[in-house]
Amino acid sequence: AIAHVLYGGNTLLAHEVGAGKTFEMVASAMESKRLGLCQKSIFVVPNHLTEQWASEFLRLYPSANILVTTKKDFETHNRKKFCARIATGDYDAVIIGHSQFERIPISPERQERLLHQQIEEITDGIQDTKLAGGNSFTIKSLERTKKGLEARLKKLQASDRKDDVIYFEQLGVDRMFVDESDNYKNLFLYTKMRNVAGLSTTDAQKSSDMFSKCRYMDELTGGR
């Protein structure tokens, strides 16, 4: 599994509970750094498991330099300072809770670009569905999703751009590991395939945020 992460790129570790996913991810991160494949990894884990993850990390690599978030780090008056620590520190890894991770925004420019792409895909999808004689429920569902994305784009374009915000791209992380990634589901995905069970026609905000950050990581690694 570790070799697959190192040489195979994006990897899903779908072992049973207790089969060693934590150690596999930790070893993958440290070996990646040793081999020069990355400089700083970020581990996105359930909020209540950050300390446990830190303990397991140091059990495997006692001399590792890791940064672990606490609740106080993401209080309004501390968040910018903590993000600056991530960006400027020479850490082997940063361990952060799911909800804290979601509070580090992607840059507005990247958000806007992704929204434009999604709106274009859905517009094409609506047209394709109509030409193929698709059912009205699917068309209406796609149109609702398109309106929602257009509203998000309009809100983003109207918002003030703050100079003092540290965006995800500025953290200096170049490898990401997500524990219990099933928390990020219900991401909208348009496909020309029909009647595929489990595909959502609506978009969950936190899943969209994760998708944007994964796309950024893929840019750094050439899609791997």
Regions found by a protein language model. Give the residues of each.
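Pre-Walker A (Motif I) flank of P-loop NTPase domains
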Residues: 7-13, 39, 92, 223-224
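SF2 helicase/translocase NTPase motor core
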Residues: 19-214, 218
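Conserved pre-motif I regulatory segment
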Residues: 1-14, 184, 193, 197
